[in-house]
């Protein structure tokens, strides 16, 4: 399991490196704004998930959490597009920023899937 953590950490670092390269290519710090959305995206889901163990229904509060998570993920891709459209960053910086976003979000999703899978196997005794 230790090698898995190292692999996920390396993939996440590569995604952040792409965003740093986007800043270098564009000669501005604007693409680094996207990194804030990477860190803010999981918090609405964590804070708004269903705490009631007796009910399997999703509540309005959980739907709001899912909506806000989607908003942060969408903004992680939309902000570089808006910056490129307004000629604040170049097309190369847009490509680096998008590659970083895809890498980071894919790493987070794979990480959550991988470790939730192990938790499900442990609970089936």
Curated annotation (Swiss-Prot):
Keywords: Endosome, Membrane, Protein transport, Transmembrane, Transmembrane helix, Transport. It is a multi-pass membrane protein. The keyword Transcription does not apply. GO terms for cellular component: endosome; endosome membrane; late endosome. GO terms for biological process: late endosome to vacuole transport; late endosome to vacuole transport via multivesicular body sorting pathway; protein transport. Residues 1-4, 49-63, 116-125 are cytoplasmic. InterPro entries: Vps55/LEPROT (IPR007262). Residues 26-27, 85-94 are lumenal. The chain crosses the membrane at residues 5-25, 28-48, 64-84, 95-115. Coiled coil: none annotated. Belongs to the OB-RGRP/VPS55 family. PANTHER family: LEPTIN RECEPTOR-RELATED, RH04491P. Involved in endosomal protein transport. This is Vacuolar protein sorting-associated protein 55 homolog. It comes from Dictyostelium discoideum.
């Amino acid at each position: 399991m230790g090698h898995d953590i190292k692999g996920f950490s390396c993939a996440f670092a590569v995604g952040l490196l792409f965003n740093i390269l986007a800043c270098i290519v564009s000669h501005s710090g604007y693409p680094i704004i996207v990194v804030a959305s990477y860190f803010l995206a999981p918090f609405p889901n964590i804070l708004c998930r269903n705490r009631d163990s007796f009910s399997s229904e999703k509540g309005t509060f959980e739907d709001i959490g899912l909506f806000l998570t989607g908003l942060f993920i969408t903004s992680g891709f939309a902000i570089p597009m808006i910056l490129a459209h307004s000629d604040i960053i170049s097309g190369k910086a847009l490509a680096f920023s998008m590659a970083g976003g895809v890498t980071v979000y894919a790493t987070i999703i794979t990480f959550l899937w991988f470790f939730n899978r192990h938790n499900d196997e442990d609970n089936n005794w």
